[in-house]
Amino acid sequence: MACHTGNRRFPSVEELSLGMAQMTLLGTPVSSGTFDSVETLADRMGELKINDKSKVAGLTSVWVASRYNPFQGGALFKSHLRCNSLKKIIYRTDRNKCVKTAKVYLDRGGPPQAEDWEKLFECAIGLLAKQDWGDSQFREETALRLVVAAGGGVKRDACSAGTGGTEEGDSDTEEEPLEKVMERATKRIIEETARLSKRRRPEALEAALELRDSFKILSAQGGPFSKLSKDEKTRWVTAFSKCLQPILDLNEGRLLYDYVKQVGSK
């Protein structure tokens, strides 16, 4: 698998858990049940019959992309209730050194190559410790290189998992109503804000709630999106796009934004 993201996007934990994306490590497909939640991921990864380096690569790739911080508050406490070998590897690293490594590569504009496992792993741990560091592109690139370093890959389903829409070439498939997509996506965005740092969380949650309220108001005023005039549809798309601007660093925020742009271009 190529190491660059291009127009790819590292799948969210929700997409992986629903089987809308598939991760392989050392050529071994990872069951979708492994990704039931970010919090239980280490325990489930620990059950795989592959070496610890590959397990840790898969674990940290999802944690990095999800902006999960295993060193913080309740996450740290819960982790030590069942501190398996993967967690021990992560918690025994020199976190200060990892944070410095992450800063170096953030300043350079890209993560270490997959071949440089030591620096790549340090960079990933630094990003876990500094939850608000790095934009989505940098984190997704880091996540992809971690999986590549483990001799694996991540393949997304043809369906756009977060939206229910389809890719080019699937025009015969009935498109899911925008209302259902928005309802599901706004719920996921609000859930994702709960995993953000204390500093980032209030602003992101405010934007997510504004998006939800905007959707409710427009739905009550205009009826089904599919029945609206072109001008009304444009008004909806503009309103949603504006609400999403402050949360484009969230996986689900970016996914919904791309979907809204796609709808607006039709």
Swiss-Prot record:
Residues 167-177 have a biased composition (Acidic residues). Keywords: Virion. This is Probable matrix protein. Residues 158-177 are annotated as: Disordered. It is found in: Virion. The keyword Hydrolase does not apply. Signal peptide: none annotated. It comes from Quaranfil virus (isolate QrfV/Tick/Afghanistan/EG_T_377/1968) (QRFV).
